[in-house]
Each structure stands twice: as structure tokens, then as C-alpha cells.
Amino acid sequence: MAETKIIYHMDEEETPYLVKLPVAPERVTLADFKNVLSNRPVHAYKFFFKSMDQDFGVVKEEIFDDNAKLPCFNGRVVSWLVLAEGAHSDAGSQGTDSHTDLPPPLERTGGIGDSRPPSFHPNVASSRDGMDNETGTESMVSHRRERARRRNRDEAARTNGHPRGDRRRELGLPPDSASTVLSSELESSSFIDSDEEDNTSRLSSSTEQSTSSRLIRKHKCRRRKQRLRQTDRASSFSSITDSTMSLNIITVTLNMERHHFLGISIVGQSNDRGDGGIYIGSIMKGGAVAADGRIEPGDMLLQVNDVNFENMSNDDAVRVLREIVSQTGPISLTVAKCWDPTPRSYFTIPRADPVRPIDPAAWLSHTAALTGALPRYGTSPCSSAITRTSSSSLTSSVPGAPQLEEAPLTVKSDMSAIVRVMQLPDSGLEIRDRMWLKITIANAVIGADVVDWLYTHVEGFKERREARKYASSMLKHGFLRHTVNKITFSEQCYYVFGDLCSNLASLNLNSGSSGASDQDTLAPLPHPSVPWPLGQGYPYQYPGPPPCFPPAYQDPGFSYGSGSAGSQQSEGSKSSGSTRSSHRTPGREERRATGAGGSGSESDHTVPSGSGSTGWWERPVSQLSRGSSPRSQASAVAPGLPPLHPLTKAYAVVGGPPGGPPVRELAAVPPELTGSRQSFQKAMGNPCEFFVDIM
């Protein structure tokens, strides 16, 4: 004898009910359904049924004619009984408590296997519970009913009628319950004022459970308590809206003439409420699905050709799929896209992850950091005198310094720079923990992914084979490391990134030059046994310190030269600055005539004495031309301190250490070495005496 199964949801209750009518599905009417519900006040409810509309697809249709035929899907009728506005209070109490002893349904209904979007379900919490194997649903229902009875007896006045303190204790849930944690985080923003309850929905639009929230004021208090109980559950999911949980359903038509097999493996999900749907487990290379590229692991299979998998058991769905694949002709697959295209597991539940608010300021700063909109490296308020050109020179000459502008990656780029880009979070390379022989490899990559990334993101590779050779070179240079230290590169192996700091010892200032410029061409330091009075002029003119740095301090009682020079220095330091500035020696006059070629401007200089270090730097002609005498300039500083050195480009007196090789002026030094030394001086922030590369 034919029979019809009717599955109906009572108002706010989470567990649906199942009844069987001894009537054929095509002849069952609303009156037949109401006769089964004779122990319920059916006049107090509105009846909604799952129906199919040509324009909108699956909808909820209200039927109030007792003689109307009920819409049926696969031999089942799905209905929702919603308490009508203005219904008597007995209807609500009977609707929630009279059928608590009915057993739950045996078939899958409203779980994750249902192809309806989440907005179709009036009970979002119920539909979400089918996604995992949590067993706390029944205990949650019993706790809520017990709490409702306790509230009816003794509930004190509370803000918005919502308790904020002992939510976990009242629910009887452990402190680490994900749903209660999210509820406590979001409860302050999930409720509205209690006085505006009559015509206002208390739930967000994403849950769409506000149909029955408008009741007469006579029973508003009792209904508000029940509504708050449901809101506790709904607020746990209020952060998962339609934008993150709605099913993106696509239909893919595959031409099986070009490919010999479909190329997918499917898995079925089941829980204590029945089967939960068919999912794409993995995709095999060379198949029709892999060639199309739109279907990914984790997608839910809803329909194959004209056969709908809705409310179909997993065994039946697998049998139907095998029959269709064995036939010839194109195959159309209708799938619901998964929430995460690259899940760590095929069934990642979004509500298991905590939802945090977004800080716009942190978002913008992070975006600016990744796009390169950063302040200049190493700048400070006191170094504003350094121009952009010198700052760029510093950045380009010091290895490892961040570049001001992001340059495209090519095969000629530094390998360490390419590795740094590969390790960025948004580089496109999948870096995650992987399992190999029951060993967890942290932050590992697959060799094939590395080759694909290099071939896609680095310019200059004509073939993928060249990118593979480059990856092998990265392994040899230590930028990639195998788990067991294999030296041959394989695309099937897992690799981790090596320590970039291990290569810093081999870096020097001339890392970008080649040939003879890699060798030091400056004068070497003298032998330690050779006396070298540093009071002489420097062989090179180094730029002075920025204005923010104090002048170099010279101890008045310390001598760099011989004993006689030290006595002169001591006497000079005790005398006034004007006396010291007037000391001149015949040797200095000869050097001036020789170095300047008889220039008149050079004779106006005040040069440090050869016997005592009375001043560290040359004074420019511009200062003397303003009418300031050497006496007044020297007296402007304290005795024993060298005069302040302004930024100037005047050449120093050419001189070298005794016994050393001849030295050159700065103009005679090759340009690549000059820029490197000058940028090094700016980086150090203080004038240096001599700098020699240690090869």
C-alpha cells in the first residue's frame, strides 16, 4: 500500500518530526495532514511546504486550503508549522512541549546533504548541527527547556532580558565550548531593545527565523523568553552570514570524448542523524574534472545529469553515479562549492574557528607593508640633510637592505630575494605543515609547487625545465633543505626553507661588482711598529657627520704623536684657542704650496699642525670669505675640542702614513668604490679614518 512521509518542523524546535500517511504522495492533501495532527491546535499554526517555483527555484509555500494537494519531493513532504500571529498561548505551550516524546526521524532531513541554501532553512542552528558529529544537540534542548521553566518561576529584571554572567553555567556546557564562546563575544551586538519587540525581528537577516517573532502584547513576556533562548543559539552563528555560508552552486558539463575517465574520488559524510551528502574527495590528473578546473576537493555533489542527489542515501548516490559514468555522452555535474578552496581537511567547519573583529588601521598598515609603501629605511628627523639620492645609494649598496621600489623577479635577481618573496604569506606558494612517515614537517613545500611558482612568478624561464634547474640550484646553495639532507632535487619531495642568515658572512660592500673591483685598491693600513701621527691631513676627504651628531671629542691630555708633539699638544690645550689657531710650521707651508699648485685660495686655509692634532678637518674658503678670522672661529669652541666641521666638498691635503704606499685623492678612486665608501660613511653616522675591505 502506498504511503507518504511528511517531515514537519514545529515553530522553534530544533528536531523535526516524521509522520506517515497511508495515502499516495500525489493525492495527499492538507486535510490529511491536519488529521494526523489532531492532538495539536492546528488552527493556531500556519502551514508552509517546500515547493518549486519556476522563477525562484526552491521556496516555502504557504497552503491554507484543506483540499489543496501537498507538494512532494521523492516521496516526501517537508513542512514548517509556524505559530500564527495572535494565536492563543496554549497553542504555543502545546506546540513546544506536548510532542517531546516523539522519536527523531530516521532519514536524513535538512542536513548538509540538502541542496537548499542556508537561507531556506528557518532553523539555522538545526541545519548547522548536521555538519559535524557534535553530540550536544539533545542536551542543549533539554537544558533550554529546563531553563525556560525556571525563568517562568523566578526571573529578575535584566538588561534586554538577556543574562550576561552565567551563560555557560546555565547551559551546562564546558567552558571551552565554541558556540558559547562565540555567543559571549557577540551577544552585546546581537540584541535590540526589548521595548521595540512587537514589530521588529530579534534575529539577523541571515538566519531568517523572525517569521514568528511578532506576537500580541498580552503574551509578549513569555514569548520573549523563548525567543531569547533561541537567540542564544542563533547568536553563536550570527557571524556566519550568507556571504560565508551560502552555497555557490555551479553546473559543469564535461566532454567525455576527449578524456577517458572522470577522474574524481568521492566520499560520503554521515552522522547520528543520517547520511550527510556526497563530496569530492580528490581529483586525479588527466581526468575530465581536472581538465575543466572548476571543481575542487571539498565540493558537494548535488546532481549528476538529471538525477538529483537530494535526500538520497550515500549508497544510492554512489550507485547512480557509477551507472551514469559507465554510459556514453557528456556528463553534467552540479556541485556546491566548498567554503575554503584549499582546506586543510576536506570538511573544515567555519564555525569551529573563532571570529575576530577587523581593525581597519591594522589592515591598511599591513597592506601598505606588502605593497612597499614604507618610509625610507634608516631615516630619522636628525638626518634630514641626507638627500634622497644618498639614501638610495645607501639602500642599493648595503646587501640585504629593503628596496624602496619592488622590482620584478627575474632569473638574474638575487636568489635570496626570490626566496624571501616565496616565503611571503600572499606569495601563492602553499607553505604548511605536512606529514611524512608519521613525522610532521613544519612549513614545508612540495618540490613541484616550487618549480611551478618559479616558472610563473620569475621572468626569464623559457621552459619549465629551466625552472626545475633553478630549484635544484636553490637546494645546492642551501636556500631549500630536504628532511634527510638529500642533495638531489625531486618534485615529489618535501622541502623547507634554509637559514638565510648563514650566508651573511660571505657578503661585502661590493657584492654587486665584479672583476678587479672585487679587490681592495685603497692604501693598506701601516705596520703596527711604524709610528703614525694622525694629526696629519687625511688622504681622502670624507663627508662630515649629519648636523644632529655632536662633534668628535678629543682628549686635551692625550697625544697621538711623539713625546715632543705631546708636550706641544698639552701646552696648546691649556692655552686659548686663538693661540692654537695661529701655530704654523714650515712643513705645512711646503705641503700647501705643493698640493695646491700655488693657488691663492689654498693659502687662506687653516690646516692642522703636523706636530699636534689641533683640528680634525679642513675649514672651507666660504667661512673665511665672510670676514671671520681664524682667531674668532677657533675661539668659538671650548679649549681642547676640534672646530665644528660643516658639510663641504673641499679637498684635504694629500698625505699618507710614513713608509706606506702613495695614496690618491677621492677624485682618482674608481666611481664604484667611491659610492660604496661614501654610503658606508653615511650609514655609520660618523666620519671614519680609514676603511679597508678584509678579503
UniProtKB/Swiss-Prot annotation:
The DIX domain promotes homooligomerization. Residues 89-236, 551-641 are annotated as: Disordered. It is found in: Cell membrane; Cytoplasm, Cytosol; Cytoplasmic vesicle. This is Segment polarity protein dishevelled homolog DVL-1. The keyword Nucleotide-binding does not apply. Ubiquitinated; undergoes both 'Lys-48'-linked ubiquitination, leading to its subsequent degradation by the ubiquitin-proteasome pathway, and 'Lys-63'-linked ubiquitination. The interaction with INVS is required for ubiquitination. Deubiquitinated by CYLD, which acts on 'Lys-63'-linked ubiquitin chains. Belongs to the DSH family. It is a peripheral membrane protein. It comes from Rattus norvegicus. It comes from the Eukaryota. Interacts with BRD7 and INVS. Interacts (via PDZ domain) with the VANGL1 and VANGL2 (via C-terminus). Interacts (via PDZ domain) with NXN. Interacts with CXXC4. Interacts with ARRB1; the interaction is enhanced by phosphorylation of DVL1. Interacts with CYLD. Interacts (via PDZ domain) with RYK. Self-associates (via DIX domain) and forms higher homooligomers. Interacts (via PDZ domain) with DACT1 and FZD7, where DACT1 and FZD7 compete for the same binding site.
